[in-house]
Amino acid sequence: AFIAYSVGNRPGEEKPPVPKVPGMVMAGTDDGIIPPAASQEIFDGMNPPKYFVSIDGAGHLVFSDICLIGRDQGGLVGLIGEVGLDLPESMTRLASDGCEDGQLDPAKAFPAIDHLSVAFLRYSLGIDPEPVGLDPAVTKNLTDAKVTLTVDPG
């Protein structure tokens, strides 16, 4: 089993072989690093059983706690600037995508990301004989963020 958080191929890049194991792909709809359509394309090409999680308004870093580091000091980019280092534009974008005003606060998505990741792995690895907490309706109970789960059991 595998989980891919914000995944995609670069234009012109050869597509990797399709895994023959259950998979889950998660993407933020406001990801400026890997377009959500690229993650959707990976999901579309996967073998079932497969799961796709879309997090509305979330950027690239929604799947990490990087946005929480030095939040009150301008985040990671602010901290780097504070110590006098220059960060190339490409790295500035990467270090802030998902942490900016107008994007979903990543901490609001953590409960859904954590729950769906664990539920998927428990089922896929045989710990749970039937899916538990992998129904699309469950996302409404996890967070006030809009999280959409698409399931293709095969």
Task: Outline where the language-model segments fall.
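The feature captures the conserved acid-bearing segment of alpha/beta-hydrolase catalytic domains
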Residues: 1-63
